Amino acid sequence: MPNWCMNTVTITGDANKVAAIEAAAKNDSLLEHLAPIGEWDYGTAVETWGTKWDIIGPDVQIEEDGKTMHLNFDSAWGPPTEAYEKYIEKNPDMSIEASYYESGMCFIGWYNSSEELNESFEIDFADEDWRDDIPQDLIDDWGLDDEYENWKEWQDDEDDD
């Protein structure tokens, strides 16, 4: 069973393409739509999508103009940035911005096709300087200060046992 990576994504561009992506996301086949692999194969999925399976639990909102979609979902083990890259290669008129947080494996990051940005950061709450290398926007967006406080409480409880 995988750790689940939480993802938040904004996709912008042609309204017809956004509608097609929306339909795929609601059918739990977003990644197959963005970067088709046909019959599922573990190695092909990881190489093409960056994750083992397609997404689960999508929450989709479309802006009124139909050209922007906001999407939250979980993916297995890590974010599907490879699928984003493959989609953008074939659809340069579209843009994808994403951020993600995987609490079990302790990493966070973001992707932005317009800025050619794809960065991941390790989270080590045991290091008092854990914030130093992580952009503040990511810390705020994913509530890492609260996560850190919860971690400290858990550590205190462990020490009391």
Which sequence ranges carry the predicted segments?
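Long, contiguous binding/interaction regions
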Residues: M1-D161
